[in-house]
Amino acid sequence: MKYFFSVDLGTMQDFTAISVLERVPRKMPADKLPDDPSLGAPRYTAVYVMRHLERLPLGLDYPTIVEKIKGMLSHEKLARQSNLIIDATGAGLPILQMMQQAGLAPIGVNITGGGMVTARDAGYNVPKAELVSALNLVFQSRRIKIPVALRLKAEFLKELERFKVTMNNTGVNTYESAVASVHDDLVLSVAMGIWYAEKTEGHTYFAGNRNAKARTMDDPLEYL
């Protein structure tokens, strides 16, 4: 099991959103194993359990945000096996640097309107469409679990419902809330964590070697 601690940084008017995802293996049914023996025999698919959602109060300064995150990451489970993903777009870069100075190891995600993922210092440039696509994939393949008692669950689902795809003048899909008054901070926080987990860990675990990766496979099972 591994945790993905993801932070979508806000502004004076927008919340900073924190999400914690736990990646756990779920056994795959025999009829969903690959036919190609060269791929091995993946027996488990990755499922993401949303363990925590939080919005920080508006107006917090950067040092306070960094201390808050550092304190949360000192939790026993998170300290041992977590990845810290942070929105490094715009004003996010100074916070990323402050986290590094505080002894943390953040992975920066600079959200762009482009069409390709590219590497950058301490992270990636990632099109917003890529983030939303990764989130859509785990929902469509039923590989995400939202506990009934999860704090801010209703707000997250409201954001998700009102997120829409629009087409700009250059023909590139963009993703934004369909209602101007509805934030997208929770959705983007979760999407960044999912995207990074899927990129670095893959979709499936192999029997005997759970760190191995395999081709993308849909999982028709119901939510846990």
What is the predicted function of each stretch?
Residues 135:
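Mobile, glycine-rich extracellular loop/lid and propeptide segments
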Residues 138:
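Carbohydrate-associated surface elements
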